Design a protein with these regions (language model features):
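Structural signature of multi-pass alpha-helical membrane transport proteins
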Residues: 1-36, 40-56, 77, 160-230, ...
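Cytoplasmic-side transmembrane-helix entry/capping segments in multi-pass membrane proteins
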Residues: 33-45, 65-69, 90-101, 123-128, ...
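Alpha-helical transmembrane segments and their cytosolic membrane-interface
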Residues: 116-164
Length: 320
């Protein structure tokens, strides 16, 4: 609340995340986001799913080169980040690979566990990466939009639509967990909402109070990821991940620029779509800016699918 009152872009999300980082550095407990976190991310997923149109799926069919660019970006970003973390920062090889890949936090932690790496280090690295990316996005908004999100007005929400929205989120959360979807709290409601959009032409959306709830939920969920981290771990993690992101910026911008040309979508959309981490966070920023959040999520999901399918095969240290 203080961050929003002070005029900080993304204040409702960055504020809780910063408090969590501070509490962890001071060795204080951080409460879990609990059901609120799932519901907040579910509201975002349902809203994005309601914006999905056939063109977002056809783009993957009509532009097969998009798959090559995305795959190339994933491997190149992972390889460059892996070199930085293992050669410069002294990370263990397996952990460095999964910490460097631009995939979902939960998925990367699970892959690290399966590979016998240090899952805790990977979790902290991805949490810090998302925090730094959000801070960078807030600075960019403050610079380009003078701290305002006025470029996109959220529509009012009728009572019937609100009831349907909450029903979709509930069903999506249950179904997503049951069938073990990646990032189930986002993807479950997103798929149910997208189905309603395609079949019944019923496009669900959120209003400003619900977006604030989503920001709070995502921010506190990120804050909870810092639980158990010491000040030295956070300090060293910040400079290591900052250095890695600086190494990835040229690849990030190049991939976004190439896909912008292939798809004729704006550069802002592609920068959010190819941001090296933070699917829910980047989708929320896209929603607030009116920058095609459905397409942003589509490309993030494509990236996660590629990583889950090929991460172990692409691991550059397997023959070492």
């Amino acid at each position: 609340m203080l961050a929003d009152w002070a005029g900080v872009p993304l204040g409702w999300m960055l504020g809780p995340a910063f408090v969590g980082l501070l509490l962890a550095a001071l060795n204080n407990p951080i409460g879990s986001d609990g059901p609120l976190g799932n519901w907040g991310r579910g509201l975002l997923g349902a809203s994005v799913g309601g914006m999905l149109q056939s063109e977002h799926l056809l783009i993957l069919i009509n532009a097969p080169e998009l798959l090559l660019v995305t795959g190339g970006y994933v491997f190149a970003a992972g390889f460059v980040g892996w070199l930085w973390l293992t050669r410069v920062c002294g990370w263990q090889s397996q952990s460095g690979w999964y910490a460097a890949l631009p995939g979902g936090l939960s998925e990367m932690v699970e892959l690290t566990r399966q590979a016998g790496g240090r899952a805790y280090e990977v979790a902290l690295a991805h949490a810090l990466r998302i925090f730094l990316l959000l801070s960078l996005a807030a600075l960019a908004v403050a610079f380009v939009h003078e701290g305002s999100w006025s470029g996109f007005a959220l529509p009012p929400l009728a009572l019937s639509d609100a009831l349907m929205l909450f029903a979709v989120v509930w069903v999506g959360l249950v179904l997503g967990k049951r069938i073990r979807l990646p990032a189930h709290s986002v993807m479950g409601p997103l798929l149910i909402s997208a189905l309603l959009s395609f079949v019944l032409d019923w496009h669900l959306s959120v209003n400003e109070p619900l977006v604030i709830v989503a920001q709070l939920a995502i921010g506190w969920s990120l804050a909870h990821r810092f639980q158990g981290s010491s000040f030295p771990q956070i300090r060293s993690g910040l400079w290591q991940i900052t250095g890695m992101l600086l190494c990835l910026i040229p690849l990030w911008v190049l991939a976004a620029w190439v896909v912008m040309i292939l798809t004729e979508h704006g550069l802002a959309v592609m920068l959010l779509a190819f941001a090296p981490g933070g699917q829910a966070e980047m989708a929320l920023i896209a929603l607030l800016l009116g920058a095609s959040p459905a397409l942003v999520v589509t490309l993030h999901v494509l990236r996660v699918v590629l990583i889950l399918s090929f991460a172990s095969r692409w691991y550059p240290g397997k023959n070492r």
